[in-house]
Amino acid sequence: MEIRTCKKCGFILGTRPNSKDVGGVCLACLNKDRKHGINWEERQKWLTQFIQDNKNADSKWECVVGVSGGKDSCTIVKRLIEHHGVKNPLLVHVCDEFTPSEAGIANLDNLVKTYDLDLLNFRCAPQTFVKETRKSFFEKLHPLEWVEKQIYAKPLETAKAFGIPIVFMGENPAFEYGESETCEIFHPASDGSTKIIYFGSIWPYSNADSLAQAQSMGFRTLSDFDDWQRQGSADDFTQIDSKGYMIQLWTKFIKFGFQRVSDVACRFVREGVLTKEQAGQMIKDSDWICDPLAKKDFCRAIKITEKEFDETIDKFANTDILVKDANGHWRRKDLI
């Protein structure tokens, strides 16, 4: 199989499910250019009015925000309160069964205290988490399929339970990662009584902007703590909540030839933070690496051995694009 990469950002082409490219340029890069044609100020004014017009007088909360200890959650809440007149959002945090990072704990605590907000920590049934995660890992190498559905579902369920008409989520993944050419405002699960809004379709999403906004209110990165010196990563400020969760992202490398390093490095190219060559070197050096602490935490949480983990990885390895190196690590054929 010929391995192709985007002419603009260097991302591997043709392996991400549902992704598209045109003339050797990934749709994520093309969508970056499409953002210039969106009237963001108009969308922001629309949102302020939409929130005002759709308040439930019988509810103490104007909206629900699905949150974590990450930068995007801080930015969404900050802008809702400071730019859109929201007084009292209800924050909903869905937990997994992995070990939380000190940074994630600190950031979520800081977010709640900064604006004096209500927070619901939703712990999904732990035995079901283990059962479903094991099943999806062994059968599909898609370990967190079940809990990721909960991360989207629980804020909506909470909103419906309390009669709250609006739910906010972060970026529009289909647009940002090159599956759709349209920057839709509403999530497909929106209905007549509850609207789910992608905040990244109201304010143009970028890692740099989100980080700057979050740091202005005290956001802390993994490097501010000593509990997790993460490997196989392009940064210390994205996906920082829990350690074992990173395996969900890393397994994409085994199936599709990319993981979080490619996603972040190529996004940095689109944002002007890195050159294509710098991103390519970062991908070559780090995209294949499975963080050892994440692997250990994942195996502990779902009660499997590291040998079982390795055997399952080998079973699903995409040998069209990957080959094992001399040390037994799966690597992209074009980068070894």
Which residues does each predicted region cover?
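Short glycine/serine/threonine-rich phosphate/pyrophosphate-binding segments
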Residues: 71-76, 150
